[in-house]
Amino acid sequence: MSMAGWITIGIFFLCVLALTRPLGGFLVSVLEGRRTFLSPILGPVERALYRFSGVRPEEEQSWSHYALALLSFKIVCFVAVYAILRLQAYLPLNPAGQGSVAPDLAYNTAVSFVTNTNWQSYGGETTMSYLSQMLGLTVQNFVSAAAGIAVAAAIIRGFARRESKAIGNFWVDMVRATLYVLLPISVVLSLFYVFEGIPQTFSGSVVATTYEGIHQTIALGPVASQEAIKMLGTNGGGFFNVNSAHPFENPDALTNFVEMISIFAIGAGLTNVFGRMVGNERQGWAVFSAMSVLFFVGVTAVYWAEAHGNPAFSAFGIDQSLGNMEGKETRFGVAASALFAAVTTDASCGAVNAMHESFLPLGGMVPLINMMLGEVIIGGVGAGLYGFILFAIIAVFMAGLMVGRTPEYLGKKIEAREIKMTMLAVLCLPLVMLGFTAVAVVVKPGLAALSATGPHGFTEALYAYTSAAANNGSAFAGLTANPYWNITLGIGMMIGRFFVIVPALAIAGSMAAKKIVPPSSGTFPTDTGLFIGLVAGVIIIVGGLTFLPALALGPIVEHLSMLRGTLY
């Protein structure tokens, strides 16, 4: 662990902190329909979209209509992406002559990008045409992220409004998030990435001759534009198979730093949106503070584990001064790789600049735990905030039980309906993560995909289903997905996305209809250090202890075995 590494982590956090309030203010203006500096340019486009699609922006929706609109849109998106992938061989912009995608892989990929997971059971440069990458996958990177922002906005309105049946209009929220937030920032990021050397071309692959006289095919494509929204929208699906470890996706330390900032930017800004819209900015900073505490715990743990190197190698006299460099790029090193791993799994991004499977057992366990906690540490675009609010509801419910009074959050009483919806959303994740893993490690198709045995093989399976249910998309790359995995992972992605969103919207509708209760001497304050500690504790206890037995069978046992000289 070096001073340079800690300085990198510190500067990264300060940059995120500096962006939180200004970006939060801009997001509030966009979501509330106020005039912004982009309105003269994009206002006519927004109004034209409403006229063309028949949307009446002044008409708001109840939570059930909001959820129905979202689910209907997602079904259309799934069908569109699936059709593009299945017909790929007959569509233009396919200079490499890629064939049509197999049915199970097309299903898995369509579900993956529609749910903002971006799990990839394929290598992008060897499977997808340029049209599929742009029209199919990149479009979903925009609209899936916009849907997350829309849901977060709807839930915030649920707490901010009183005696209201409406929580907003899904179509309006999604259009505004796409037009005013995601597209403009992505354009700026794309230009920066092109300047840094990331390709943006429709030309086909280039054949080069190496120093050894061997011919090598170098894949190109419209990479920069996809890279921008891939990070900003916490999507994570790479244009190339090795994702952001590829020099054409992430060429140097500067692009690596900007990509990490992009992952956290909107999620951090939404915490400020929360505070502003409920009328108390301190509430937003309390949420951000709780997330930050958990972030530093995680990044410290993974950095410590990777910086100390592999003790089994040290026994052979191998120099470990650089830490565990297996699976890492020398242009980034251990510190930047550890930070990237923490950031991408704190958010539901899933992009990687190093191979998580090559991390040491405890180092690989940290990204796994981040996902098991529901990725509420900043989290995915929108998803992190509403996931955190679910845990905040549990925290104030527990606090209410301890003092013998009806729990309240932001002046709204937390009653049986809200607790039932919260537990439905919270419990569906471990059900998928643990249940599907248990089945996969005892059936032949499940075992056939694993490249390792023992605890490491178990961790491969556990990581895959955890990543799918958490809508992250990163993987222990030794797993070779077959039709069994493609189908079951797709099911896990849908449950992890929509079995959280729908209960969260139901809570928003219920809270919007309630009166705001004036605070009293018995009201539990939710903008103090006590609340921050309580929520962090609930996240660790409720989220973490659920998975302790599974972690004991995987990375913990593997770590203890490694100390005795046994590697997997």
Curated annotation (Swiss-Prot):
GO MF terms held by the record: P-type potassium transmembrane transporter activity; potassium ion binding
GO CC annotation, single: plasma membrane
Membrane topology label: Multi-pass membrane protein
Subcellular localization(s) per the UniProt record: Cell inner membrane
Keywords, alphabetical: Cell inner membrane, Cell membrane, Ion transport, Membrane, Potassium, Potassium transport, Transmembrane, Transmembrane helix, Transport
Residue intervals passing through the bilayer: 7-27, 65-85, 136-156, 179-199, 254-274, 285-305, 332-352, 354-374, 377-397, 423-443, 487-507, 530-550
Family: Belongs to the KdpA family.
Protein's recorded name: Potassium-transporting ATPase potassium-binding subunit
Naturally occurring in which organism (per UniProt): Granulibacter bethesdensis (strain ATCC BAA-1260 / CGDNIH1)
